[in-house]
Amino acid sequence: MPRSRINGNFIDKTFSIVADILLRVIPTTSGEKEAFTYYRDGMSAQSEGNYAEALQNYYEAMRLEIDPYDRSYILYNIGLIHTSNGEHTKALEYYFRALERNPFLPQAFNNMAVICHYRGEQAIQQGDSEIAEAWFDQAAEYWKQAIALTPGNYIEARNWLKITRRFE
């Protein structure tokens, strides 16, 4: 039985029911349906903090999913898990891969900026202001891209860009 069928969360159950109805009425292949089931189960496991299970489901969804747009969200979610696990290099790789397939993911740009900013802060703590500035400059570029895609969002990032004189 798919994980999403046994999840006790009302929102997850509602999402699963709606998704099942849509899968019945929208013409899709069996592979697309199976990919979506794995993706949905991955999201369910991820929301509960079961990252290993979520990754297994996402990797299986990636194997089956052929649509680049849908693949971008799978890759993005894999990046989120690696970010949560502190595996920032891997996370950046998955965010890049997601953006290759869908350049309109402001949340991926934002998460990449957050990682770069964090690395800049680490460099300051280690006394390397030159490396810190390079990381901060990279964070600024990613935040600018996120803001360009969704101008009303990322207010804190916009303020940081203004305060640090990185916003044009």
Curated annotation (Swiss-Prot):
GO terms under cellular component: chloroplast thylakoid membrane
Entry keywords, A to Z: Chloroplast, Membrane, Photosynthesis, Plastid, Repeat, Thylakoid, TPR repeat
Function of the molecule: Essential for the assembly of the photosystem I (PSI) complex. May act as a chaperone-like factor to guide the assembly of the PSI subunits.
Species assigned in the record: Solanum lycopersicum (Tomato)
NCBIfam families the record matches: PRK02603.1
Location in or out of the cell: Plastid, Chloroplast thylakoid membrane
Highest taxon, organism lineage: Eukaryota
Protein name, per record: Photosystem I assembly protein Ycf3
Database matches in InterPro entries: PSI_Ycf3_assembly, TPR-like_helical_dom_sf, TPR_rpt, Ycf3/AcsC/BcsC/TPR_MFPF
Membrane-related topology note: Peripheral membrane protein
Major site of localization recorded for this protein: plastid
GO biological process: photosystem I assembly
Keyword Metal-binding annotated: no
Per-repeat ranges for TPR: 35-68, 72-105, 120-153
A family per Pfam: TPR_1
Family in the record: Belongs to the Ycf3 family.
Entry keyword Transmembrane: no
